[in-house]
């Protein structure tokens, strides 16, 4: 059986990362995640992530630059793997289209977020990414 890849985007702005509050399924509704979705047959992971983020956040694919991986793969089940990538927002303003709400959170706030269980595995990696962003812009988050 083929392994389904699901990609998630860590959209970083300054010292914050964008998180999205789920609407469904009922057992995950109200919890927060990095936005993203499934890679379609014949699609690269980066192209799939740009497409999914554009659809979910009301952006254009040209507004997004998908960068390096963040953290390790997370096995959702025996046939599905979740992967995160850092994403640079080149234009546009994200809007909640498929989610209840969006929120920009700092590294200090990551542990306070009511994450979907799978995304909890990236908290330390996201904190390192955000703290690295702070060093890049010569300010402390």
Curated annotation (Swiss-Prot):
Q: Specify which residues bind Mg(2+) according to the UniProt entry for this protein.
A: 37, 52, 55-56
Molecular function GO labels: 8-oxo-7,8-dihydrodeoxyguanosine triphosphate pyrophosphatase activity; 8-oxo-7,8-dihydroguanosine triphosphate pyrophosphatase activity; 8-oxo-dGDP phosphatase activity; 8-oxo-GDP phosphatase activity; metal ion binding
Cofactor(s), by name: Mg(2+); Mn(2+)
Please report, in chain numbering, the residue ranges of the motif Nudix box.
37-58
Where's the Nudix hydrolase domain?
Answer: 2-131
Q: According to its UniProt record, which reaction does this protein catalyse?
A: 8-oxo-dGTP + H2O = 8-oxo-dGMP + diphosphate + H(+)
Give the EC number(s) under which this enzyme is classified.
3.6.1.55
| InterPro entries per the UniProt record, alphabetical | MutT-like, Nudix_hydrolase, NUDIX_hydrolase-like_dom_sf, NUDIX_hydrolase_CS, NUDIX_hydrolase_dom
Highest taxon of source: Bacteria
**What is one Pfam family matched by this protein?**
NUDIX
Q: What class of enzyme is it?
A: hydrolase
Q: Which SUPFAM superfamilies match?
A: Nudix
Q: Which residues cross the membrane?
A: none
What UniProt keywords are attached to this protein's entry?
Answer: DNA damage, DNA repair, DNA replication, Hydrolase, Magnesium, Manganese, Metal-binding, Mutator protein
Q: Any idea what a deletion of this gene does? A: No visible phenotype.
What does the record list as GO biological process? Answer: DNA repair; DNA replication
The answer to whether UniProt assigns keyword Amino-acid biosynthesis to this entry is no
Q: Which family does it belong to?
A: Belongs to the Nudix hydrolase family.
What does this protein's UniProt record list under function?
May be involved in the GO system responsible for removing an oxidatively damaged form of guanine (7,8-dihydro-8-oxoguanine, 8-oxo-dGTP) from DNA and the nucleotide pool. 8-oxo-dGTP is inserted opposite dA and dC residues of template DNA with almost equal efficiency thus leading to A.T to G.C transversions. MutT specifically degrades 8-oxo-dGTP to the monophosphate. In vitro has 8-oxo-dGTPase activity.
Q: Anything further noted? A: There are 4 mutT paralogs in M.tuberculosis; the exact function of each is unknown.
Name by which UniProt lists this protein: Putative 8-oxo-dGTP diphosphatase 2
Lineage, broadest ranks: Bacteria, Bacillati, Actinomycetota, Actinomycetes, Mycobacteriales
Q: What gene does this protein come from?
A: mutT2
């Amino acid at each position: 059986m083929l392994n389904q890849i699901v990609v998630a985007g860590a959209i970083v702005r300054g010292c914050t990362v964008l998180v999205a509050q789920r609407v469904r399924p009922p057992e995950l509704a109200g919890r927060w995640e990095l936005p993203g979705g499934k890679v379609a047959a014949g699609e690269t992971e980066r192209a799939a992530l740009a497409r999914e983020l554009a659809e979910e956040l009301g952006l254009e694919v040209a507004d997004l630059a998908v960068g390096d991986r963040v953290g390790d793969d997370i096995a959702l089940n025996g046939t599905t793997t979740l992967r995160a990538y850092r994403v640079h927002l080149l234009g546009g303003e994200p809007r909640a289209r498929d989610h209840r709400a969006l929120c920009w959170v700092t590294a200090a706030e990551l542990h306070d977020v009511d994450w979907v269980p799978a995304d909890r595995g990236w908290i330390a990696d996201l904190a390192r990414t955000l703290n690295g962003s702070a060093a890049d812009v010569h300010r402390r988050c």
